[in-house]
Every structure is written in C-alpha cells, then in structure tokens.
C-alpha cells in the first residue's frame, strides 16, 4: 500500500500492489462518513504505519492512471491489510479514475 501525489508522506491517493502492478482503490462505499469509511481509514492508515486515524478525501489528487484494483471495499477496521477486507475481486470494478480514493492519516 502506498500514498501518491500528496503533500506529505501521510497524505495522498491510495494505491495497492497486486500481481506486481500498482493500482488504485475506488471510492464506492467509502466516500461518505460511516462505518465503512471508518473501517477503511483504520485499516489503510494502520497498514501504512500510522495511528489509524484520519480522513478519506475523494478529491485534491490527480486521477490515477494505473488499473483500478479494488472496488466496493468493506472493512470492519480490524483487518491487518486492505486485501483482507471484503471487495468485489481484483480488477472487478465499475469506476473511473476520478473516483480514486485518497487518504490522510494522522502521523
């Protein structure tokens, strides 16, 4: 997992490595406040080595150009990494890159 095109190491567009290729995560299910967004933030920030607190902005970053690897992400918040969350399947998505999710974690 990495954050790219942000202003600091704890802020940027979320990308996940699958099959040796970096790709984006679609904001479906996690773009609005609620348990799914909270779970996503907790897992992603924790996986990156941050406190697990933060926000998930859907704008402010350039659109990704890599494949969209994950869509309809549903994390309880207890998973060790994003691939352990429920999602549609690697590369199974109905998103455009303007829907790429960002992340801002508390350092």
Per-segment meaning from a language model:
Residues 1-107:
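Intrinsic disorder and flexible/low-complexity segments
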């Amino acid at each position: 997992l990495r954050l790219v095109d942000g202003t600091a190491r704890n802020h940027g567009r979320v990308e996940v490595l699958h099959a040796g290729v970096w790709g984006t995560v679609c904001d479906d299910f996690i773009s609005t406040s609620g348990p799914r967004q909270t779970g996503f933030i907790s897992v992603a920030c924790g996986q990156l080595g941050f406190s697990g607190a933060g926000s998930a902005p859907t704008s402010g970053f350039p659109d990704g150009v890599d494949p969209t690897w994950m869509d309809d992400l549903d994390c309880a918040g207890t998973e060790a990494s994003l691939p352990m969350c429920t999602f549609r399947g690697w590369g199974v998505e109905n998103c455009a890159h303007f829907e790429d999710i960002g992340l801002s974690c508390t350092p």
